[in-house]
């Protein structure tokens, strides 16, 4: 049985399409230094659209790796790293330089997709993380809980998703 819903994300020009199946692990905004640097790196590409919000945060939806796939245009995807030896890849659709998702060379069992790439019924934001790194003088909205680092709620959601993967749910 296929978990529902199925959400589709596309690059700005429509040449790359991603599919995420089932309930996401979490929908969050990250303010860490690496996400801010990564957003600037991608935004500096020719014709790239905005990646970070005006307050410096980057909105993501996290999905289990086993429920996330590129269904169109995989040959157009290119990884960008902040440092050559970094395990973190910010994946961009080269056709229009749209930020698509973040994955890792090793480690985490999840994929961090850029929330702005999704269409239709997009899950609402649930929390803001790593807010201690937000730009100086930035006032954050109080629409969802905020945490200076990685809150226990996020860690629990990640652990629950991993257990569900291990037992085949």
Q: PLM features: residue spans?
A:
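A short Gly-Trp-Pro
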Residues: 1-10, 16-169
């Amino acid at each position: 049985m296929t978990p529902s819903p199925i959400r589709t994300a596309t690059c700005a020009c429509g040449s790359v399409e991603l599919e995420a199946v089932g309930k996401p692990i979490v929908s969050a905004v990250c303010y860490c230094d690496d996400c801010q640097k990564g957003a600037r790196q991608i935004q500096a590409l020719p014709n790239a659209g905005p990646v970070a919000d005006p307050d410096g945060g980057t909105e993501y939806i996290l999905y289990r790796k086993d429920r996330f796939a590129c269904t169109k245009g995989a040959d157009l995807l290119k990884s960008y790293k902040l440092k050559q030896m970094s395990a973190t890849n910010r994946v961009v659709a080269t056709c229009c330089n749209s930020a698509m998702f973040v994955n890792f060379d090793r480690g985490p069992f999840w994929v961090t997709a850029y929330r702005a790439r999704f269409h239709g019924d997009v899950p609402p934001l649930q929390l803001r993380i790593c807010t201690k790194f937000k730009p100086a003088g930035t006032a954050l909205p109080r629409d969802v809980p905020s945490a200076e680092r990685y809150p226990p709620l996020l860690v629990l959601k990640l652990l629950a998703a991993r257990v569900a993967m291990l037992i085949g749910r």
